[in-house]
């Protein structure tokens, strides 16, 4: 029972925040290229390059 609870808790914690990501149309080849883009658009440099486009996390 404890293991089931811990697995469920871990799943919930890992899934938090994925829906908050904001996609942009800015092309990138590395995560460092997205930091100034995210800072300019959303006020925070939290982002990464995914599938050739910047994805920002508020």
From Swiss-Prot:
Superkingdom of source: Eukaryota
Cysteine pairings via disulfide bonds: 28-49, 34-54, 38-56
GO cellular component: extracellular region
Keywords for the protein's UniProt record, in alphabetical order: Disulfide bond, Ion channel impairing toxin, Potassium channel impairing toxin, Pyrrolidone carboxylic acid, Secreted, Signal, Toxin, Voltage-gated potassium channel impairing toxin
InterPro entries found in the cross-reference section: Scorpion_toxin-like_sf (IPR036574), Scorpion_toxinS_K_inh (IPR001947)
Signal peptide location: 1-21
Modified-residue entries (Pyrrolidone carboxylic acid), positions: 22
Annotated positions for site Basic residue of the functional dyad: 48
Function: Inhibits voltage-gated potassium channel rKv1.1/KCNA1 (IC(50)=780-2110 nM), rKv1.2/KCNA2 (IC(50)=0.19 nM), hKv1.3/KCNA3 (IC(50)=67 nM), and rKv1.6/KCNA6 (IC(50)=8.9 uM). Its activity (tested on Kv1.2) is not voltage-dependent.
Family: Belongs to the short scorpion toxin superfamily. Potassium channel inhibitor family. Alpha-KTx 01 subfamily.
Swiss-Prot/TrEMBL domain comment: Has the structural arrangement of an alpha-helix connected to antiparallel beta-sheets by disulfide bonds (CS-alpha/beta).
Protein name: Potassium channel toxin alpha-KTx 1.16
Organism this protein belongs to: Mesobuthus eupeus
């Amino acid at each position: 029972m404890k293991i089931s609870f811990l697995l469920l808790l871990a799943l919930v914690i890992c899934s938090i925040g994925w829906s908050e990501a904001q996609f942009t149309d800015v092309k990138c080849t590395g995560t460092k290229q997205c930091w100034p883009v995210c800072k300019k658009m959303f006020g925070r440099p939290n982002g990464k390059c995914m599938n050739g486009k910047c994805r920002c996390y508020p």
